């Protein structure tokens, strides 16, 4: 077909011939193509038209118009038949015999075959039919076959489809429910881990606070003593070159009193009586903890609070001093008749006695203050521990209530 199409193609427009005209040299061209060539030849000639030459062989022709050329009816008919063949569908060929058209219908096997299949193949003893007769019979058979196929097990198929979709939906719901359980489990586990981490870190912060409350007062006392010492040196530097006797003696007296006070001020102990914070603390020991026992993680039992080794009797002495002061202030009001002048005089005497007593007992008071600070620090740490234990207990109770839906 491709070779035939080349012979039916116009050399000028490269399309199939349309109303082909033949030149005296026997070459064929489309009528419209020749008209275009002749018009161009006339426009390019100023005085007299030049002879028309064949586009293929360049042979001159005496034709002055396309209408004077002969129509090639044979070629025109061939082109028309070629167009019809090209438009019509191609006949299928046999797969077993290359190039042989399937132009016979085997009634026995109900299929198209070629001539070789009918004469020398497996269909030799079968019943054959023409394509037209087979088409008429199969066209009628198609209607009944289509109707029976349309209702073939349709109800059963729809029922099974509905069952499969229902089972699929239930399976997805179960998987979603299980995945939600897994998500909830890990969310609770993460919450427990975060809670336990915050609890242990809170214990560390409490211990840090205890360290600062134990050491900071002593450090501040030493810094105060050093500052007083620097001030005394500054005073000495200021008056050591004074030549006025009175001023020098006055400054010397103040300097001597300052040095006396500094020397009489006791220095705090550098090694405070506290127990170690932790013994053999190692987080690698937590590697063997199971997930179910995560809530049981805790710091070693010998940690968390400074254990003071201060004896109990200084606290007793301090309490006695406090009670004595309360008795001095409030005793006359409670047990004696109230008189403004006598009351003021009595208060003055008591305060004078108490002031002299305190002046003579400076060391005792400083020791009492030291022990009092230790006692308040201990109460503060104890209160923090009680608060932490209470919060943990409340959280456990809340989780127990939520878990078993008691409310």
From Swiss-Prot:
The protein's annotated pathway: Protein modification; protein ubiquitination
Zinc finger (RING-type): 10-58
Membrane protein topology class: Single-pass membrane protein
Post-translational modification: Auto-ubiquitinated; requires the RING-type zinc finger. Auto-polyubiquitination leads to proteasomal degradation.
Gene3D superfamilies: Classic Zinc Finger (3.30.160.60), Zinc/RING finger domain, C3HC4 (zinc finger) (3.30.40.10)
Coiled coil region boundaries: 172-200
Reaction catalysis annotation: S-ubiquitinyl-[E2 ubiquitin-conjugating enzyme]-L-cysteine + [acceptor protein]-L-lysine = [E2 ubiquitin-conjugating enzyme]-L-cysteine + N(6)-ubiquitinyl-[acceptor protein]-L-lysine
SMART domains assigned to the protein according to its UniProt record, in alphabetical order: BBOX (SM00336), RING (SM00184)
The protein's assembly and partners: Interacts (via C-terminal domain) with VCP. Interacts with AKT1; the interaction ubiquitinates AKT1 and leads to its proteasomal degradation. Interacts with MDM2; the interaction ubiquitinates AKT1 and leads to its proteasomal degradation. Interacts with p62/SQSTM1. Interacts with TRAF6. Interacts with IKBKG/NEMO.
Free-text note regarding domains: The coiled-coil domain is required for the induction of autophagy during endoplasmic reticulum (ER) stress. The RING-type zinc finger is required for auto-polyubiquitination.
Name the UniProt record assigns to this protein: E3 ubiquitin-protein ligase TRIM13
